[in-house]
Amino acid sequence: RAAWKEGEKPGSPLSVRAKILTHDSRRYADELYWWEARPEVRLGPPSWHWVERAIESTRQLNAPGILEKITTPILLMATTADRLVDTQRIVRDSKRLPNSELLLFGNEAAHELLREADPVRDMCLDRISRFFEERAPKQ
């Protein structure tokens, strides 16, 4: 299997990368603006150390009883159309978190939910606001 999925490989055409991240070309253009204005914010591919640490942390989270012990309220947001992460895994793990809620989108959303077209982005922002109001009301 290839080490990179289409659009993840460093140097992939920006049009491919854009489609994987968002349906909103203006919000993707914002990323390109910042890459040009502040080149130091542009990230390259992960280091081997990062990959090793990610694998180890995933291994630890997979252990029985670990996610089940987390009692902090957690709002997860994902899309079944995500081409970068395993949405089935997010759904499965959300069921292991005793105090979590999952907002799941379909083909209307790509990976970057808060950089999506307004209907999706607005739903996310609204749900985040309501989540805080419900779970951490102002005193």
Label every model-predicted segment.
Residues 26, 45, 49, 88, ...:
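Conserved active-site and cofactor/substrate-binding residues in soluble primary-metabolism enzymes
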Residues 70, 76-78, 82:
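Short beta-strand/loop motif that positions the catalytic acidic residue
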Residues 46-66:
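Active-site nucleophile elbow and catalytic-triad environment of alpha/beta-hydrolase enzymes
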Residues 100-139:
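Catalytic active-site module of serine/aspartate enzymes centered on a nucleophile-bearing elbow/loop
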Residues 1-45:
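Alpha/beta-hydrolase-fold enzymes
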Residues 83-86, 114:
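Nucleotide-sugar-dependent glycosyltransferase donor-binding/catalytic pocket residues
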Residues 63, 72, 85-95:
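Short alpha-helix in the alpha/beta-hydrolase fold that links the catalytic acid
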Residues 71-73, 99-100:
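A generic structural signal for alpha->beta connector loops
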